[in-house]
Each structure stands twice: as C-alpha cells, then as structure tokens.
Amino acid sequence: MKVVLIHTSPVSLNELKALFKEIVPEVEMVNIIDDSLLEEVKKNGHITPAIISRMNSYVQVAKTLEPDLIFNQCSSVGEAFDLARKQATCKTLKIDEPMAEKAVSLGSKIGVVATVASTVQPSSDLVRNTAKKLGKEVEVKEYLVDGALDILMSGDVDKHNELVINEIKKAEEENDVVVLAQGSMTAILPLLTDIRKPVLTSPRLAVERVKKELGL
C-alpha cells in the first residue's frame, strides 16, 4: 500500500518516517516537500491563491502515483488541502484531524498552542468544526508562542522548548485539554512531567488513523 505525504517543511519528515516504520511498516511513503508554502503563509498571514494552486498541483501529482491515501502534513495549509482533496480519487487525511477529534472527546475547554501565527486560526477552526460535526459545544482558547518555530529552525532547541512549555502550562490552567498545533512540538512531550491535563500532538494520532483507514 502507498501513502503520498505533502509537507511544507523537512522538519517533519524524519519523525513521520519513524512513525510509519513503527505503526505501518508495510506502507510505502512517498514525500512531496515544498518549504515555500509555509513561508508564503507566514508572510501573508493566510493561504493565498498561489498556495491553493500549488496544493492542487501536488494532489494531482499524488494521484499519478496511485496512492491509497494522500496525507497533508501542515496545519497552516489545511484550508488549501481541503479544497484540493475534493479532486482526490483515494482517501485523504489532514495530520491534525484525529487530534481534533480526540480533543473534543476529552473536554469542552480546549487550548490550542501554536508556534506559527498562521496556524492558530486553521487549528482553532478545525477544533470548532470537529465539535460541530460531533454535536458537541466547545470553548477554544488560542495561545501563540510567536517566533518559537524560527528559534527551533535556527537550532536553539532548548529556548524553543522553554518558551513552548511555559505557554502549555498557562493553557493547562485554563482548559480541560491542550492541543499542540505544530507537529514539531512533539519532542516536548517527555519534558511535561508536571502537566496533569491531556496534551495532544498530531503525528502519532494521524499515523494511527492511516493504519485504520487502510484497514491494516
């Protein structure tokens, strides 16, 4: 079986490769990476017609590979993928969809912590829309650790972790469950030893959903 993944950063690639190897080792991964997508979203603060056009192109390319599922890795371009996935002839999945479903099942007050401003709205909207589909009422609070991803990309992992952990602690005090909007925050989980509320990240939940969707 085959899954085509559309990435906006190489940062996520190794983690997802490891998760696929662990959870669905029989699945072939094909990766499409365009790091200009995320930069364009960050620059404009929202998706643009050019981003939508490129995402459509990548889904078309993915279709030629005859995959069993097309996987969107980046929350910031989720709205573009929602448009592009309509032309897919196979199953599709956004990395944060399973996480949003789990968050809604765990509580009515949900904190969304993001390290990229352009991800805050799409991630929050996804939680709200998921709750609506499931017939639940939720209150979503947003927490932006502005610039933290840039700090991580520059190599200062400790500073990135410190900033994000402080924001997670704040979100924990005000919510039933905390959602981490960037998959790049997954490495922080082992450091959250004094956090008692559920803290959810998307990569593992998404790959577990891939397994379910493919019937493996």
Predicted regions mapped to residue ranges:
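Non-catalytic structural scaffold of enzyme domains
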Residues: M1-L216
